[in-house]
Amino acid sequence: ADVPGNYPLNSYGASYYCTI
């Protein structure tokens, strides 16, 4: 994800939880 955290803040708008 873009930022290390538990919120949907990536380019896809899904909850990735900073896994990618």
Curated annotation (Swiss-Prot):
Q: Where in the cell is it found?
A: Secreted
Tell whether Lyase is among the UniProt keywords: no
Gene Ontology CC: one annotated term: extracellular region
* SS bond partners: none
Regarding tissue, the record states: Expressed by the venom gland.
Q: What is its main location?
A: secreted
Q: Which GO terms describe its molecular function?
A: sodium channel regulator activity; toxin activity
* Keywords per UniProt: Ion channel impairing toxin, Neurotoxin, Secreted, Toxin, Voltage-gated sodium channel impairing toxin
Q: How does it assemble?
A: Toxin b is a heterodimer composed of toxin alpha and toxin beta.
Sum up the protein's function in the record's words. Answer: Binds to sodium channels (Nav) and affects the channel activation process.
What's the protein name? Answer: Toxin b subunit beta
Q: Which organism is it from?
A: Androctonus crassicauda
